[in-house]
């Protein structure tokens, strides 16, 4: 579906099927709204629930993401970074979407909190049958949460396959270079010659013709 061609009503209906979890939990929440109002706003805007029913649904969403119903009236600055991201997740779940886009949803969090949020997302996926489009640069996170992986270079997908194939036997030289760039904290763990990408990254405004990677490709 080309959403750019949808009219306002069609786009409004389509938005219910797709939601997003933003990268920065500190700037993605309105500081003047309570946590309960933030999560409940989609329910009101799409005329799903109002009044007491809305409060009940928000409380259920809070519980589902590991927050307490007593925190509904708290403002964003009263939460930690991990808790704020849980609010963002609850907001994304409010409309019961089919697809959730995660725009680097854990990159701004401490490593210990990252694991908690990732595990929450995986539990929600299993429980609700969600599909995620998870954007990330941390390969450890990608390997942990994904089923299929698409590797992009200058805005173009250069390789897409299942997780196991990608990490065990990458086919594109850029994917190989990415995986070889990950340090292994063990002496003698890597016996093969390290693959290093040489040259400068071309301008994304005026990318090379054909395969965008050919100016740096060792096989070209």
What are these regions (language model features)?
Residues 69, 162-220:
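Charged, flexible cofactor/metal-binding loops and thiol motifs
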């Amino acid at each position: 579906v080309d959403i750019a061609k949808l009219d306002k009503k069609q786009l409004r209906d389509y938005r219910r099927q797709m939601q997003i979890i933003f990268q920065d939990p500190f700037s993605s929440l309105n500081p003047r709204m309570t946590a309960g109002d933030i999560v409940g706003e989609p329910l009101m805007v799409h005329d799903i629930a109002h009044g007491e029913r809305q409060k009940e649904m928000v409380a259920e969403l809070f519980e589902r993401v590991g927050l307490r119903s007593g925190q509904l009236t708290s403002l964003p600055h009263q939460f930690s970074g991990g808790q704020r991201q849980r609010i963002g997740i609850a907001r994304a779940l409010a409309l019961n979407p089919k697809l959730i886009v995660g725009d680097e949803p854990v990159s701004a969090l401490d490593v210990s909190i990252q694991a908690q949020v990732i595990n929450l997302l995986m539990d929600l996926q299993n429980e609700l049958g969600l599909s995620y489009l998870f954007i990330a640069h941390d390969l450890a996170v990608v390997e942990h949460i994904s089923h299929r992986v698409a590797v992009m270079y200058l805005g173009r997908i250069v390789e897409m396959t299942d997780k196991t194939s990608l990490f065990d036997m990458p086919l594109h030289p850029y994917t190989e270079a990415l995986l070889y760039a990950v340090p292994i904290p063990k002496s003698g763990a890597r016996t093969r010659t390290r693959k290093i990408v040489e040259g400068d990254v071309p301008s994304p405004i005026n990318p090379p013709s054909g395969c965008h990677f050919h100016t740096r490709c060792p096989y070209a």
